[in-house]
Amino acid sequence: MKCPFCGGVENKVMDSRVSRDGNAIRRRRECLACGRRFTTYEYIEEMLPTVVKKDGRREPFDRNKIRMGIRKACEKRPISTETIESLVTEVERFCQDYSGEEIRSSMIGEKIMKLLKELDGVAYVRFASVYRQFRDVNDFLEELKEFKQLHDLKKEKEP
C-alpha cells in the first residue's frame, strides 16, 4: 500500500477491525519511510454495473467518485468519516442490484440525495445544488422550499 504522504510502499498494519456494517476491514497503517499513519479500507471486489452518463457515455462504477461527492457535500458538517463510508457502501449495494447491467447516473444521484436528505439538510442541499445544476438563486430557493415542507411534515408526525 502506497503512503499518501511520502509515496513510500513499505508500511506496517497497526490495527485492523471490521467496519460497523461488516462489509469492510478498516486498517490503520504506519509508513516505515516517514512514520505517518493513514487508514485504508478493504472491500470484497464485486461485479458492479456500467454507469450511463447523461450524455450517453458509459464508464465503470467508481466507488471513489461517490465518496468524493458525498464527502464534498458533508464538508464542515458534523458527519464522521465512518458515516460517509457507510453511505458510500449503501450506494454501492444499491448499484450491485444492477450487476453486469447498466445503471443511469441519475438513479445513483437520486439515491445519494435521498440518503443525504435523511442524514443532514445542509449536505443534501449542497449535493442537490451540484447534481441538479442550479442555474440561479430561484432554483436554489425552490429546492430549499421543498426540503422545508418535507422537514415540517416529519416534525408534525413526531409524537
From Swiss-Prot:
Family: Belongs to the NrdR family.
Keywords from the UniProt entry: ATP-binding, DNA-binding, Metal-binding, Nucleotide-binding, Repressor, Transcription, Transcription regulation, Zinc, Zinc-finger
GO MF annotations, alphabetized: ATP binding; DNA binding; zinc ion binding
Organism: Syntrophus aciditrophicus (strain SB)
Regions annotated as coiled coil: none
KW Ligase (keyword) present: no
HAMAP family listed in its UniProt record: NrdR
Cofactor binding note from Swiss-Prot or TrEMBL: Binds 1 zinc ion.
Name of the protein described by the UniProt record: Transcriptional repressor NrdR
UniProt key word Transcription regulation: yes
UniProt-listed InterPro entries: ATP-cone_dom, NrdR-like_N, RNR_NrdR-like
Gene expressing this chain: nrdR
